């Protein structure tokens, strides 16, 4: 079965550009053939209402992505975030998760950063 996914952020942006509601844009995306949503974790904080809305439009969560700052966050904070990420994916039935490991900032010691990342 082939699935056609769209980033949830694109739905929000299209709704804003067209001056329409988020809900109507979700419905329009479904009419255009999209079946799945690629979602940023922070957009799914109101799990029950969001899942009900997606389901009412005939859409499902295909994947959930989130940014992690493995270089600056404690391992405990990263693990807590990842646990929430996986729990949310399970709740929505998402088959894929993507952990984005953050970015180096200007002035960061890249070699030390890679070494710290390798330790974790």
Language-model-detected regions and their locations in the chain:
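N-terminal pre-domain/capping segments
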Residues: 1-94, 112
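Active-site cleft segment of glycoside hydrolase catalytic domains centered on the general acid/base Glu
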Residues: 107-120
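Short linear capping/connector segments at secondary-structure termini
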Residues: 102-105
């Amino acid at each position: 079965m082939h699935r056609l996914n769209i980033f949830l952020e694109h739905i929000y942006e299209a709704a804003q550009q067209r001056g329409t509601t988020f809900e109507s844009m979700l419905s329009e995306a479904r009419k255009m053939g999209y079946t799945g949503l690629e979602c940023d974790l922070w957009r799914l904080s109101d799990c029950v209402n969001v899942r009900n809305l997606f389901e009412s439009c005939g859409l499902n969560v295909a994947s959930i992505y989130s940014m992690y700052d493995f270089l600056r966050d404690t391992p405990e904070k990263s693990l807590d975030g990842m646990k929430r990420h996986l729990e949310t994916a399970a709740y929505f039935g998402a088959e894929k998760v993507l952990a984005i490991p953050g970015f180096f900032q200007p002035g960061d010691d890249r070699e030390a950063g890679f070494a710290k990342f390798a330790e974790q």
